[in-house]
């Protein structure tokens, strides 16, 4: 599929549900110590994503955009500021952003010149690794806002997400010292349209938060099933079921209608399953 190298904000707004948006904002800073960086962050993308956050991205970014962080996507070497990882290592990083080959990626920046320098650098990086459906958002986030595009100001957008996600934090069923009362949990599930007797498949990143929600759901009379592999397994074995275009989570479910409720990190996916009548 051929795509335009440069796309206008109005087009992005109109095609928002069919693209994967990446924020390539980067704040200039002195080059990191090579030995220290390699010891702490080299090919340790989870650590980097937890510790090397960009304040501009956290303050404001396009709704649903993940941050393509130059301080993580590349590494410093003796003679290069932004050294390229191997294709396998790079793929491991961008999968954490919910990016898979075949997605139409739209990359934007901010600040001077609309952030086109950083966005273009990210563009050519993806092209180097064989990603062909990549575009740059002309004018960056400021132009997007002028086109009535939606932005958000929080730090929970990174990571893999499902289409039409509805957040259901573990805090809906757990308090600081343990599970909430059954009546409170009943109300929390009911608020999401999940009632006694419904069958749900519950999953999260690695199965921890989902286990607690699954237990609370079972206590509330819901037929709760835990998907052990979680988003982590899906990212490697069935990435087509992730990243804004999810239509089915489990291959065996062929005659069921699924509504997805996704959570990031300490959140979980609850999939309400109803038989088609």
UniProtKB/Swiss-Prot annotation:
<dbReference type="Pfam" id="PF00581">
    <property type="entry name" value="Rhodanese"/>
</dbReference>
<dbReference type="InterPro" id="IPR036873">
    <property type="entry name" value="Rhodanese-like_dom_sf"/>
</dbReference>
<dbReference type="GO" id="GO:0005739">
    <property type="term" value="C:mitochondrion"/>
</dbReference>
<feature type="domain" description="Rhodanese 2">
    <location>
        <begin position="155"/>
        <end position="243"/>
    </location>
</feature>
<keyword id="KW-0808">Transferase</keyword>
<dbReference type="GO" id="GO:0016784">
    <property type="term" value="F:3-mercaptopyruvate sulfurtransferase activity"/>
</dbReference>
<keyword id="KW-0677">Repeat</keyword>
<dbReference type="InterPro" id="IPR045078">
    <property type="entry name" value="TST/MPST-like"/>
</dbReference>
<feature type="active site" description="Cysteine persulfide intermediate">
    <location>
        <position position="204"/>
    </location>
</feature>
<feature type="domain" description="Rhodanese 1">
    <location>
        <begin position="15"/>
        <end position="153"/>
    </location>
</feature>
<dbReference type="InterPro" id="IPR001763">
    <property type="entry name" value="Rhodanese-like_dom"/>
</dbReference>
<protein>
    <recommendedName>
        <fullName>Putative thiosulfate sulfurtransferase mpst-4</fullName>
        <ecNumber>2.8.1.1</ecNumber>
    </recommendedName>
</protein>
<dbReference type="GO" id="GO:0004792">
    <property type="term" value="F:thiosulfate-cyanide sulfurtransferase activity"/>
</dbReference>
């Amino acid at each position: 599929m051929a795509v335009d190298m440069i796309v206008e904000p109005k087009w992005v707004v109109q095609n928002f549900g069919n693209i994967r948006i990446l924020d390539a904002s980067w704040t200039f800073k002195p080059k990191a110590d090579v030995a220290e960086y390699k010891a702490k962050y080299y090919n340790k993308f989870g650590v980097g994503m937890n510790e090397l956050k960009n304040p501009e991205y956290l303050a404001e970014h396009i709704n649903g955009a993940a941050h393509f962080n130059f301080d993580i996507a590349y590494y410093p070497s003796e003679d290069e500021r932004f050294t390229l990882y191997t294709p396998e290592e790079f793929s491991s990083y961008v999968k954490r952003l919910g990016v898979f080959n075949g997605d139409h990626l739209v990359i934007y920046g901010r600040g001077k010149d609309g952030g086109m320098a950083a966005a273009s650098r990210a563009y050519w990086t993806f092209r180097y690794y064989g990603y062909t459906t990549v575009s740059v958002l002309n004018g960056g986030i400021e132009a997007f806002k002028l086109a009535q595009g939606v932005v958000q100001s929080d730090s929970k957008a990174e990571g893999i997400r499902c289409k039409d996600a509805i957040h259901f934090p573990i805090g809906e069923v757990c308090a600081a010292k343990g599970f909430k009362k059954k009546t409170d949990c009943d109300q929390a599930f009911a608020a999401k349209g999940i009632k006694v007797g419904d069958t749900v498949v519950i999953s999260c990143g690695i199965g921890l938060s989902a286990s607690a929600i699954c237990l609370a759901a079972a206590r509330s009379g819901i037929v709760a099933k835990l998907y052990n592999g979680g988003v982590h397994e899906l990212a490697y074995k069935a990435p087509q079921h992730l990243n804004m275009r999810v239509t089915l989570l489990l291959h065996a479910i062929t005659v069921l209608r699924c509504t997805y409720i996704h959570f990031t990190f300490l959140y979980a996916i609850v999939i309400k399953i109803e038989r088609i009548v």
